[in-house]
Amino acid sequence: MWRLYRKTPKQLRNSVESCFKSVNSRQFSVSSFSAVAKDDKSVLKQQEVLHLLAKDQRFEERFFNQVQQTIRYFASKPNDLKKFFRKEASTDNKESSSSSDKKDSKGNKGEDNNPFNQFPGGWQQIAVSVGILLALYAFMDYQSYREISWKEFYSDFLEAGLVERLEVVDKRWVRIVSSSGKYAGQTCYFNIGSVDSFERSLGAAQHHLQYDADRQIPVLYKSEFNFKREIPNLISVAFPLLFGYYIYRMLKGGGAAGGAGRAGGGGLGGMFGGFGQSTARVINREDIKVKFADVAGCEEAKIEIMEFVNFLKNPQQYKDLGAKIPKGAILTGPPGTGKTLLAKATAGEANVPFITVSGSEFLEMFVGVGPARVRDMFSMARKNSPCILFIDEIDAVGRKRGGKGGMGGHSEQENTLNQLLVEMDGFTTDESSVIVIAATNRVDILDSALLRPGRFDRQIYVPVPDIKGRASIFRVHLGPLRTSLDKTVLSRKLAAHTPGFSGADISNVCNEAALIAARDANHEISNKHFEQAIERVVAGMEKKTQVLQKEEKKTVAYHEAGHAIAGWFLQHADPLLKVSIIPRGKGLGYAQYLPKEQYLYSKDQLLDRMCMTLGGRVAEEIFFGRITTGAQDDLQKVTQMAYSQVVKFGMSEKVGPLSFETPAPGEMAFDKPYSEATAQLIDQEVRDLVMNALRRTRDLLLEKRSDIERVALRLLEKEILNREDMIELVGKRPFVEKNTYEEMVSGTGGLDENVELPKGLENWNKESEKKKKDEEKKKNDE
């Protein structure tokens, strides 16, 4: 407090300290204050001020009244206050000030009637002055008061007979008015719980000290405004009001949220990171290194996206036929199939502005931010039209309305979705060339109004690549890798060994192969590194240091041998590539199969898959007479396959040709779409189906018991067996197999993916000749 006090202007300190002296000496008046204001030498030391204040017990009342008189004096004589804020008060200034005072007293009609506008700083200087006075008042009030306990009051005042009267202030504390004693020069007080308890305690104390009626201590009850005690209450009321006013000024200064694009950057947006402004970014074409040549495995989807770019580059080609440019397209498909990569390639190839934003960026903690950002985003897009607007993960904002989950954030999400619908195709939507492209892997949860033609005219499905698509993707990712292998042959081989892999998985395999080669200090990548990379992606990291007991290792060997033999002698099971008892990931063993490219499955094919999956558990039971927990994952897979046959595919005779919708993994099922009786029937059918597969597997493995034992012993010896080892141990599979890339793609129209463009898109990346001529003519005219 005194640090703030010492930083005040010298004249103001002089006047305040002289004011303190005048109050305590009972000689203060407005005229004396005016005289003191002109005296630069009347400065008291801090200790003297405290000493003078401590002598006067009624300082609080008189000083607070004097603050009010001081403010009134400042208002009537602003020129006196002007001296307080000057570094040096010269004689000329004093004379001019006195002359101006005379003019003011006589009344000068030519000056402003508002006294606060007649000196520099105006209200700000008065506020600072009053604040310093009130702060000093609270500080001095704190210095002159001393809190004591009831015991001290009893011993130092009541027993000594020094109490003149007691003042109960606001029914909360008691001020002691005494003539002299131990605490001379200070006002002592103590807090009370309630007035009733205080009166009982005081009466008992006076009775104990045998105070007669003449000596009874008078008690006064009064209410006072104590600035120091009311500061917390004032702050609790003033702070929310000031904060609300500050927010209002920020909003007013920043303009209507989203209404003016990015013009209102100085308002609340600066404090809350954009607030109503869109976080969409305009991508510079030179910053994007991805081109359409880098996108493979989804040629149909790529052609669709190329056509959108061609709409903007050569619109006349379509307008001549009366066609309208589509409003937008939504890319759907499983994760990792290249939806965002297609958008990046579009940004790298298009000669029009490309604006990108994430769906989650629309929703913030403030209500109304989402719709405001949608408006601002489309305002930006229209200013840059023709352009492409890409919204990634649109399911964050485009969920179906009226769903079950929600509360307050759900309503905000719906408002944002409504604004998005209006901006894409609403009453005020113009015909500007803004194409919206969105991406999501949860198209099933999107609102139907968002997917209708007129908003997203096309739904482009980007599937997991087939064997030809995988070969094309491998060629792209093998390009920068250092290897002496033929990359075309290698890409086809790897494509055959990675069924079901997405583009992201293939990219990860190539990168892992390079990392493994670098770890082994090799100068190039070989076949071995790619095989290890595939195993790492499929089954996890190899754990050679994990210690297995001899009995556990033997159990794992027979378990994996059971899988291998069951799959080897079942016609519709997948061909075996490799089996290992080296722990990987969460499993203690690992078997790699080669599934064929197949989209339709019969009941017999699904049954063979179930039998192959149960082979490990049955082998443990046959050779050890017991079962272990190692088959838990196998049982989960078998149960899922059985339920799918009964509930989804209608392959149960008792349940009939019915298909019920089941919740997706991770979703909660609040109710079942069938009755309890049907549920019991389904459970019984699933149990019968699994038990039938178990009996069939047991019969097969009992017949091939010697083959299982040979494979298990070789696994304990070598730990890893490949297809050639299996042929050596048990002979060739008794079924026709397709193991090479050429065998798998035979009869599909060629070895490689068809990348031929439609005739209308052959020049998609070239400006139309007419447009070029118009631009050249315009330049010549200029």
From Swiss-Prot:
Its EC number is 3.4.24.-. Residues 88-117, 744-782 are annotated as: Disordered. Residues 1-118, 252-782 are mitochondrial matrix. Pfam families: AAA, AAA_lid_3, FtsH_ext, Peptidase_M41. GO terms for molecular function: ATP binding; ATP hydrolysis activity; ATP-dependent peptidase activity; metalloendopeptidase activity; zinc ion binding. Its cofactor is Zn(2+). ATP binds at residues 333-340. Residues 140-230 are mitochondrial intermembrane. Binds 1 zinc ion per subunit. The chain crosses the membrane at residues 119-139, 231-251. It is a multi-pass membrane protein. GO terms for cellular component: m-AAA complex; mitochondrion. Zn(2+) binds at residues 559, 563, 634. Disruption phenotype: RNAi-mediated knockdown disrupts tail tip morphogenesis resulting in retention of the pointed larval tail tip in adult males (also known as the Lep phenotype). RNAi-mediated knockdown induces nuclear and mitochondrial transcription of mitochondrial protective genes including chaperone hsp-60 as part of the mitochondrial unfolded protein response. RNAi-mediated knockdown causes nuclear accumulation of transcription factor atfs-1 in intestinal cells. RNAi-mediated knockdown results in mitochondria in intestinal cells which are abnormally elongated. Keywords: ATP-binding, Hydrolase, Membrane, Metal-binding, Metalloprotease, Mitochondrion, Mitochondrion inner membrane, Nucleotide-binding, Protease, Transmembrane, Transmembrane helix, Zinc. One of its GO terms (biological process) is defense response to Gram-negative bacterium. NCBIfam families: FtsH_fam. Acts as a component of the m-AAA protease complex which is an ATP-dependent metalloprotease mediating degradation of non-assembled mitochondrial inner membrane proteins. The complex is necessary for the assembly of mitochondrial respiratory chain and ATPase complexes. Functions both in post-translational assembly and in the turnover of mistranslated or misfolded polypeptides. Plays a role in male tail tip morphogenesis. This is AFG3-like protein spg-7. It comes from Caenorhabditis elegans. The lineage of its organism: Eukaryota, Metazoa, Ecdysozoa, Nematoda, Chromadorea.
